[in-house]
């Protein structure tokens, strides 16, 4: 035991001694200020490199000066920055790349970045938006069904069968918080609105310890934090659903920003109208769902930031009917049945950069899944609608999680991070 501890101590001192300088900071989108997750950072002319963490933070060790550090990210122009020892964070802004169809050059270059993790699949959100969609609704979960080692279930459904597992064996995380049953319409559409998502990755094997034990896979999804420079938004009305998305700064520019996204199914509008017309306004039935995302992020200073995330989604199958108790009777009864299910998530996070090598996140969160099967009956007078008799039956099932955790990212060297 003593020899093991001594070996670990010597190794720790070695890594600290070898790295004479350290360059750290945040990587963001130049136009929106959105943090770039998994951005490649490497020293020009060497094979040493790292990637930014889930909050866009990077830390790279530099052993020899002068040195130039290269930042590259899919869909963005590569940027090269000369390292100047200063001790402060060096934040980098990358601009999105425009497609120019010119000649193709093939050059041999040295391996430049850290070795990618085995079993981790990442698809840029912009590429997901270009995939074919069911009813105009792009589904981030279906995008992974096109990847090796992943299969879909029944035709058109969004469930993930990873290496022989089943969808219920996957851990689904939204901003590090678990969600349960993430499908609408019996599995044809997932609850994830692509407009509200910044980054998504699928881990098929070799799960890090922070995810716990899972049989199949881990789907790690990160919400957008919002545009830090200007208020922007978009809306759309589709065959299946309508949506609205707004993001921008609040209060002091670039310090506090927000993101809001709402998607609602349109099916119930048609079914309500058709069933009421056919029944003479005494019967209506249908199905609807909605997904609401919101997030507020405030940067306290260069080392601290706090954010609040919220998600609420519901599915509702409903049936309503009104009939007289008997022919010629002055009383009638109202009958209503609902099957409702969905998730609610709320979390508060505090991000703190302890030093040039250590980044920490404190999370307090609540997540809830609810399934409700309810039947209601009321007997009333036609004249004043006074309730004569009332009865209801409900079946409720759910899961509640209260989470308090502290995570650390320790950049030991350019090849080791904990």
What are these regions (language model features)?
Residues 111-113, 167, 179, 224, ...:
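Structural signature of outer-membrane beta-barrel domains
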Residues 238-264, 279-317, 341-366, 412-413:
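Transmembrane beta-barrel wall of Gram-negative outer-membrane proteins
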Residues 91, 141, 159, 199, ...:
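Membrane-embedded beta-strand positions in outer-membrane beta-barrel channels/transporters
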Residues 47-57:
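Short, acidic Ser/Thr/Gly-rich low-complexity loop/linker segments typical of extracellular
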Residues 188-190, 198-208, 217-248, 260-264, ...:
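Short strand-turn segments of transmembrane beta-barrel domains in outer membranes
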Residues 77, 111-168, 174-207, 224-225, ...:
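Periplasmic N-terminal accessory/gating domains of Gram-negative outer-membrane beta-barrel systems
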Residues 28-32, 39-44, 68, 72-76, ...:
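Short, acidic, small-residue-rich periplasmic hinge/interaction motif at the N-terminus
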Residues 305-353, 368-398:
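Flexible loop and strand-edge segments within Gram-negative outer membrane beta-barrel domains
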